[in-house]
């Protein structure tokens, strides 16, 4: 019974690992997918471009990294304006 549980756990881990998308360092040609959030992994003056098919290193501006929200990002609305 223990070995059956161990086998099921092992099988689940294998399935999860096989479904993962692997990202590598971007090549100079920009063919490899890359991670844009949390750091710019594109070398050689290239920038990361995010789209539906995957992130690629490209020449030019690329897509800006998402900005985290902080307290100063939003203008406070006075209570009087909300209640009226």
UniProtKB/Swiss-Prot annotation:
Transmembrane segments: none annotated. Residues 73-84 are annotated as: Interaction with fibrinogen-binding exosite of thrombin. Keywords: Disulfide bond, Glycoprotein, Protease inhibitor, Secreted, Serine protease inhibitor, Signal. Residues 21-23 are annotated as: Interaction with thrombin active site. One of its GO terms (molecular function) is serine-type endopeptidase inhibitor activity. GO terms for cellular component: extracellular region. Residues 59-84 are annotated as: Disordered. Residues 72-84 have a biased composition (Acidic residues). Its main location: secreted. It is found in: Secreted. Residues 59-70 have a biased composition (Basic and acidic residues). Residues 1-20 form the signal peptide. Glycans are attached at residue 63. Hirudin is a potent thrombin-specific protease inhibitor. It forms a stable non-covalent complex with alpha-thrombin, thereby abolishing its ability to cleave fibrinogen. Belongs to the protease inhibitor I14 (hirudin) family. This is Hirudin-HM1.
């Amino acid at each position: 019974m223990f070995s059956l549980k161990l086998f099921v756990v092992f099988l689940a881990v294998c399935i999860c690992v096989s479904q993962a998308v692997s990202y590598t360092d971007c090549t100079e040609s920009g063919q490899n997918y890359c991670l844009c959030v949390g750091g710019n992994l594109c070398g050689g003056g290239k920038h990361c471009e995010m789209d539906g098919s995957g992130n690629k290193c490209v020449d030019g501006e690329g897509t800006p990294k998402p900005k985290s929200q902080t307290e100063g990002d939003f203008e406070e609305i006075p209570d009087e304006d909300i209640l009226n």
